[in-house]
Design a protein with these regions (language model features):
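Sec-dependent N-terminal signal peptides
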Residues: 4-14
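N-terminal accessory segment detector
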Residues: 20-138, 148, 153-170
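Sec/Tat signal peptide C-region and signal peptidase I cleavage site
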Residues: 15-19
Length: 170
């Protein structure tokens, strides 16, 4: 009887080990998903810049090309105000746990502060042969082209604890 019990338990034990799945889909929080997707987006931006440079183009050229592509996705009828609202949304989303602060606003201007974008790159140096300064050059030019298309101007000022963006109606 003990033998039968021992054999049964052994078979159940071995079966449970063999039946375990090698891969499982783990639960991921929305915060983790968001952070991962921002990382993926930044990686794609860096890879785009790196590829453009490897093909003899400058960061400025690839930023202009990208801005020209992206600008037509914005509703031109929403003008500078649509751009300002879009910037608020995009900057709130593009940096995990970002808390935007509106510093000033009027009928023709919006000034807000954001956390530093892609702080890992800033603190750890080049990735995919792209520096933080090149990354920021790309973002600034890209934004300026879209702003112009929508009748706005945008400026960036890096400060100790983030970046200040000023959007003005032209």
């Amino acid at each position: 009887m003990k033998k039968l019990f021992l054999i049964t338990v052994t078979i159940l034990f071995v079966t449970s080990i063999v039946a375990q799945e090698k891969f499982v889909v783990r639960e991921i929080t929305d915060t983790q998903k968001h952070s991962r997707m921002v990382g993926q987006a930044n990686g794609i931006i860096l890879n785009l810049i790196s590829y453009a440079i490897s093909q003899g183009n400058s960061v400025e050229e690839v930023a202009k090309f990208t801005g020209d592509q992206f600008k037509t996705g914005w509703n031109k009828e929403n003008g500078w105000e649509g751009f300002a609202k879009g910037c608020l949304n995009n900057w709130a989303i593009f940096i995990p746990n970002n808390k935007l602060v509106i510093l000033e606003q009027s009928e023709t201007m919006l000034k807000f502060q954001s956390k530093t974008p892609y702080v890992w790159l800033k603190n750890n140096g080049p990735q995919y042969n792209v520096s933080y300064d090149e990354y920021m050059t790309f973002l600034k030019i890209n934004h300026k082209i879209i702003a112009e298309y929508l009748g706005a101007d945008i400026s960036f000022k890096e400060v100790e604890d983030g970046i200040i963006l000023t959007v003005k109606k032209k």
